[in-house]
Structures are given as structure tokens and as C-alpha cells.
């Protein structure tokens, strides 16, 4: 299995990255330092995670120590929904760049297709608890993303949480300069995303799987929610390979030719999550894992369900 996947502009993207969603600011610096020391080269960030400054401290330290060269790192961040207005994209990008203490990013994604009302709140809500949308169209936002590439600020651009119809709208944009190179989506055995992945691959778009372990530390977890890590069927498959359940859950997307970004701030787990290139899950076990799909989402973003660009209504 490849340790890198080639993007549609020839850039190579490491198959395994460190996720930083929900990594507490006080722990994420150490987590990123440990990850780089262990051999991680791909770090997945976002402005809305509110910890990019701390990630930047770790990156700077490792670059200064010459543990790694900048060109060997693959740093990803994402444009938040309150900055979809074309005039706001560059400012949001520059904030991320300065927080991460970098001169350029390797990949910048539109985090969600849904534009929100600009302002200090990341989730501006009305009295009924619904997100207040902005009067923006992500196709226009894409034009501003393309300008970042032209200015040499980012090597590659892509999307996240977009459905095929939404990607199609970008691909059909008049005067399109750069196709989305990546679509980052939630993906694990309870949400296998076969149709969406098949669509993306048919368009030469690499898919990154987030929440590969089902995001067990999500704040809104309910006791009755299914747990991938505790699923006895997945535990049994892992035992067969003398691997942990997490390692099988990380290996699963890799064998589907996806990029995967498990999050951890625990050094032992960060190391364990990297040890997924020395075994192969059989095609029978892969088919079994795929059969566990139940279209169960960790990240359904229900506060946006009434938004015109909410991505999860149509399973197309």
C-alpha cells in the first residue's frame, strides 16, 4: 500500500495524517511534536478547531531542530463557513498561515459547503437554534480559493463534506482554473460512503477519511450510540491480525485508496496509529467491514439542516 497518494496536480499527499479536531490547545503542541518525531509528515488543521497557534509552535520547533524540512511536511487547513464571502477568504487564510507560522500551505479546503453569516460566532444561530446562513455561493468562494493558488500561498485546494452534486457544480464552473484535488469526508465502517468515494475517484479527486475511529471523544456522544472501537465483530477481526481495533479501523480506509487522519493527543496512541503499513486486511474481511455500514454520522451538523447547501439530504 502506498504511503502517498498523488493529487491531480502531481503533488504527493501522505496517506496517513494526524488529525487535530478536538485536540485541546494545552495538549496539541506536544501531540504534533511527538507525531513528527515518530515520522508523521501530514498534519490536518482548521481554523474552527481553535488550536492552530499551538500546532504552529510545534511545527516551528521541529523545523528549527531540523527534525524535518518544510518541503517534507504536508500541512492542511480549512476555510470556515463564516468566511465564504469572496472578499473574506484571503484574510481567513492569512490568519491560519500566521497562526501556523508558515509561508504556505500544502492544501486548503472549504470546510463545509454551507456559508454562515459573518461575525465573531463560528456558529451564528437564530432563536430556533438554526444556523444563520450567509448570502454566498460556494462556487464563488472557489474562485477566491483559486486566487490563493495563483498567489503561491497554497499548493493545492479542495473541499470537505461536499456531496457529488456540489462537487459537480464546481467542476462545471465557467472559467474553472483548478479542480478540487481532495474531498475530506467522514468515513468508517458505519458510514462507508461507497457511492461518494466512487464518484470522487471517477473525477480524479482523492478522498480523505475523517473520524475513522468514529470520534469516540465527540462532546455530543449519547450512551446508546454505536461504538466502532467496542464493536465485538471489529475486535475479532483485529485479533486475527494481532492488531488493535484502532489499527484495523485506520488500515480499512488505506486499503480503499483513501487518505486517513486519526486524531490523538496520547503519545502511545499516536505511535500505535502509525503502525498500519505492516499488515493487510484480507479482501473477505474488507467486504465484512464494508457490510457494517448503517449510514451513521458523527458529524451530521444538524443545526444546518435547513441551509440551502446542507450536504447530507441527498444520498446521490
UniProtKB/Swiss-Prot annotation:
Spell out the subcellular localization from the entry: Cytoplasm
Q: In which tissues is it expressed?
A: Abundant in the testis, skeletal muscle and kidney.
Q: What is its EC number?
A: 1.1.1.21, 1.1.1.300, 1.1.1.372, 1.1.1.54
Instruction: Mark the residues carrying the PTM N6-acetyllysine.
Output: 95, 222, 263
- Name the Gene Ontology molecular function terms of this record: aldose reductase (NADPH) activity; all-trans-retinol dehydrogenase (NADP+) activity; allyl-alcohol dehydrogenase activity; glyceraldehyde oxidoreductase activity; glycerol dehydrogenase (NADP+) activity; L-glucuronate reductase activity; prostaglandin H2 endoperoxidase reductase activity; retinal dehydrogenase activity
**What is catalyzed by this enzyme?**
an alditol + NADP(+) = an aldose + NADPH + H(+); all-trans-retinol + NADP(+) = all-trans-retinal + NADPH + H(+); 9-cis-retinol + NADP(+) = 9-cis-retinal + NADPH + H(+); 13-cis-retinol + NADP(+) = 13-cis-retinal + NADPH + H(+)
Q: Where is this site: Lowers pKa of active site Tyr?
A: 78
Q: Mind listing the UniProt keywords for this protein, alphabetically?
A: Acetylation, Cytoplasm, Lipid metabolism, NADP, Oxidoreductase, Phosphoprotein
Record: residues binding NADP(+): 10-19, 211-273
User: Looking at the keywords, is Transferase present?
Assistant: no
One Pfam annotation, family name?
Answer: Aldo_ket_red
Active-site positions on this chain: 49
Binding-site positions, substrate: 111
Source superkingdom: Eukaryota
Sites bearing N-acetylalanine, chain numbering: 2
- Spell out the subunit comment: Monomer.
Protein name (record)? Aldo-keto reductase family 1 member B1
* Organism in which the protein naturally occurs: Mus musculus
